[in-house]
Amino acid sequence: MREVRLSVKAIIIREGRVLVLRCRDQGGVWYALPGGGQVAGETLDQCLRRECLEELGCRVRMGPLRFVRDYISWHHEFAAHDPNSHQVELMFEAYLEPEPSFPSQPDSMQEGFAWLDIASLPGCRIYPRVLERALSSAESNGVTYFGDVN
């Protein structure tokens, strides 16, 4: 079994829409928050800024921590893809410096990015799925731990 991986994600919201990565797999289009794994010697803020520059082509400013989740792959439907993965994700509010442009190092399944209406998230294939409910909630104080969810 591998070690636990720490990942940061950016929650960028503007005018009722959230900025997400647009990805594609055999099941079709799906969405995820921009972000990725922290490397040794890198602060969480540095990691978030690097990942957004790579995946969105823009700089961001880190805001407060909003959500934490565990993802233990063998507990979920994608276990066959990566059966030994355990990741802890820290999801921070983030604010765009310039507008997103073209990603310099998109993820392998990433097609680009999209602004999704938060109200329409229940009809989208977004991961983790709990974001459908969490982002539309009026409650924005404190940090919410989602647990081991997909």
State the predicted function of each range.
Residues 72-102, 134:
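Active-site-adjacent beta-strand/loop module that shapes the phosphate/pyrophosphate-binding cleft
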Residues 15-17, 24, 95-100, 118-120:
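Short loop segments at secondary-structure junctions
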Residues 103-135:
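NUDIX/MutT-family hydrolases
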Residues 129-150:
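Charged phosphate-binding loop/patch that engages nucleotide di/tri-phosphates or the phosphate backbone
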Residues 1-19, 40, 90-93:
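Conserved N-terminal beta-strand and adjoining loop/helix that marks the start
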Residues 17-58:
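Conserved Nudix-box catalytic region and its N-terminal flanking loop in Nudix hydrolases
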Residues 59-68:
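A short coil-to-beta-strand element that immediately follows conserved catalytic motifs
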Residues 2-4, 80-88, 107-110:
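A generic structural micro-feature
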